A protein has these predicted regions:
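HotDog/MaoC-like acyl-thioester-processing domains
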Residues: 76-81, 85-144
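Short alpha-helix capping/helix-loop boundary micro-motifs
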Residues: 67-72
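Short, surface-exposed secondary-structure edge patches
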Residues: 36, 73-74
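Hot-dog-fold acyl-thioester-processing enzymes
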Residues: 1-66, 118, 128-144
Length: 144
C-alpha cells in the first residue's frame, strides 16, 4: 500500500476526530517536531496492515475476538509503501462450538526500507476446514 497523497491521511484524521497538528499541519510538523514533516496517523497504518492480512488470515473469519498488542514502531510518512506479513502463533478448538476454532496470529507492517512500523497480535475465530464454505471473491456474482 502506497501513501500517495495526504488526502487519505487527512480524511482519516477528520473521520476519527484526530486533529493533532502532527498529522494535519505541515508548518507545525516542520517547525515543532523531530520529524520535520507530517506523520501518517498510526491507526490508519494499523488499519491498512490489518486489511492486508484479511485475505490470508481472516477472510473466512466468524469474528475478530481480540487485539492483544498494538505497537507503532516507527513513523510512516506520505509516500511510504507499506507491506504486511502475518504468522500463525497458535490454534485451539472452541470450547463452546465444535465447528470452529481460535487462531492467534501476529502481524508485522514494514515500510519500503524493511523497517518495522507496526506490530500487533490478535485472536480470530474461524470455521474448521470441514465446516468452512468455499471462499468467493467479493466481485464474483452467482449469475455468472
Amino acid at each position: 500500500m502506497l501513501f500517495r497523497s495526504e488526502y487519505d491521511d487527512h480524511l482519516f484524521c477528520m473521520i476519527t476526530m484526530n486533529h493533532h497538528p502532527l498529522h494535519t499541519d505541515a508548518w507545525y510538523a516542520e517547525q515543532a517536531t523531530q520529524f520535520g514533516k507530517n506523520v501518517v496517523v498510526g491507526n490508519l497504518v494499523y488499519s491498512l496492515v490489518l486489511g492486508m492480512s484479511v485475505p490470508d488470515v481472516s477472510g473466512a473469519a466468524i469474528a475478530n475476538l481480540e487485539i492483544e498488542t498494538l505497537q507503532h514502531k516507527r513513523p510512516t510518512f506520505h509516500g511510504d509503501t507499506i507491506y504486511a506479513e502475518t504468522r500463525v502463533l497458535d490454534k485451539v478448538e472452541s470450547t463452546s462450538k465444535n465447528d470452529r476454532g481460535i487462531v492467534s496470529v501476529e502481524t508485522f507492517g514494514y515500510n519500503q526500507r524493511g523497517e518495522e512500523v507496526c506490530y500487533f497480535r490478535r485472536k480470530v475465530m474461524v470455521p474448521k476446514r470441514e465446516f468452512a464454505k468455499p471462499r468467493q471473491r467479493p466481485y464474483d456474482s452467482p449469475a455468472g
